[in-house]
Amino acid sequence: MEFYASLKSIAMHVPSERVKNAEFQQFLDTSDEWIEKRTGIKERRFANDEEKSSDLGVIAAKQAIERAHLTPKDIDLVVVATLSPDFLAMPSTACVLSAKLGIENKPAFDISAACTGFIYLLSVAKAYVESGMCENVLIVGAEKTSSVLDFKDRGTCILFGDGAGACVIGRTKRLKESILDVQISANGNFSNYLYTPRTLKPTPFNAKEEALEPFLCMKGNEVFKLAVKTLLRDVEMILEKNALKPEDVRLFIPHQANFRIIQAVREHLDFKDEQVVLTVHKYGNTSAASIPMAMGEAYEEGRLKKGDLMLLDAFGGGLTWGSALVYFGG
C-alpha cells in the first residue's frame, strides 16, 4: 500500500440553547436526580426551530476543513451520518450540506446506522481513501434528535441532544498517523429494539394501514443489556486483533449514550479515568454526532494531540455496532 487513510482534522459544534434536567419537570413525571442517577446526563443542547441537522453539520465541517488546511474545493466526497435528516427521503443531508459548503459536482450521500453512524463513516472513508478513489473525504455526524423525540415519553426524550462533529480523512504514509482498523457489524433481528416508525400516509389502495408518528422508540432495558455485552466483546476483539492492550490507548472515546454503559465497559477493560473522554453529562446522547463531538472537545481541550491512539466504540439502532483504532494524524 502506498498510503493509509488518516484523520487529518476534527471539529464539533453544538446549539446555544441549554436544556437542564429540571426543565423536563414542567411536563413529565421526572426530576433532575432521577435522570442523572439513571443516565449521568445533567443537560443537553437543543437546536431552534429554524436549525436543521445540516445547519449544525456545516459549522463543524467548515472548521474541520480549515483545520486540515484545505478549502471546500479540495473535498472529493461528502458522507453524513444522521437519524434526523433534513428531509424524510430525499435529498440526502449530505447533498444539502455540500451545497451549503459550496461543494459542487462531487459525490455526497448519507449513512443510516443510528448511533453507530460515525464508525460506519470511518469505515467508508478509509475504504475510499486507501483504494485511491478519493484524496480528501469529509465525514459528518449531524443530529437534530429533538425533531424525532416524543416529549411525552420519559424513557426517550430525556436522553438525547443536538449537535454535530466533522472530520477530514486524507492520506498519510505513516502507520502511526493512520486509521489503523475499523470493524462494523449489524443484526437486523433486533431492529424493533430501536426504531422510528414510518410516516408515509396510507393510499386509497391500502387504507387499512395507519400512519404513525415519526418518533424515536426504544426498548431501554433490552438495549442496555445488549449494548454492554456487545461493546465489551467488540472492543476486546479489535484490541486483540491488533495486538494491543488498554494501556496502549491514549484515549478511549465511546459513544455517549449513557454513563452506566460507558462505566461498565471502562471498568471491565480497566481504563484509567484520564483515558476516558466523557461528554454525556452535558450533551446527552447525540447519536451519530456523539463520538466526533467528544473527539472535537478533547482536541480543543488539549487532551488529543497528533500521534495519539484513540479507541472508539458505538452501538445503535439496527441493531448496529462497531469500533475503531485511530491515530490522530493532525
Curated annotation (Swiss-Prot):
Q: Which reaction does it catalyse?
A: malonyl-[ACP] + acetyl-CoA + H(+) = 3-oxobutanoyl-[ACP] + CO2 + CoA
Entry keyword Signal? no
By its UniProt entry, which CDD domains does this protein fall under?
KAS_III (cd00830)
Instruction: Respond yes or no to whether keyword DNA-binding is given for this record.
Output: no
Region named ACP-binding: 256-260
Please state where this protein is localized: Cytoplasm
The name this protein carries in UniProt is: Beta-ketoacyl-[acyl-carrier-protein] synthase III
Protein task? Catalyzes the condensation reaction of fatty acid synthesis by the addition to an acyl acceptor of two carbons from malonyl-ACP. Catalyzes the first condensation reaction which initiates fatty acid synthesis and may therefore play a role in governing the total rate of fatty acid production. Possesses both acetoacetyl-ACP synthase and acetyl transacylase activities. Its substrate specificity determines the biosynthesis of branched-chain and/or straight-chain of fatty acids.
Active site location: C115, H255, N285
What protein family does this chain belong to?
A: Belongs to the thiolase-like superfamily. FabH family.
Q: Which domain of life is it from?
A: Bacteria
Q: Which PANTHER family match?
A: 3-OXOACYL-[ACYL-CARRIER-PROTEIN] SYNTHASE 3, BETA-KETOACYL-[ACYL-CARRIER-PROTEIN] SYNTHASE III
- Which pathway does the UniProt entry assign to this protein? Lipid metabolism; fatty acid biosynthesis
- What is the source species? Helicobacter pylori (strain P12)
Query: What EC designation does it have?
Result: 2.3.1.180
Q: Which GO terms describe its biological process?
A: fatty acid biosynthetic process; secondary metabolite biosynthetic process
Q: Which UniProt keywords apply?
A: Acyltransferase, Cytoplasm, Fatty acid biosynthesis, Fatty acid metabolism, Lipid biosynthesis, Lipid metabolism, Multifunctional enzyme, Transferase
Q: What is known of its domains?
A: The last Arg residue of the ACP-binding site is essential for the weak association between ACP/AcpP and FabH.
Q: Where is the signal peptide?
A: none
Subunit structure, per the record? Homodimer.
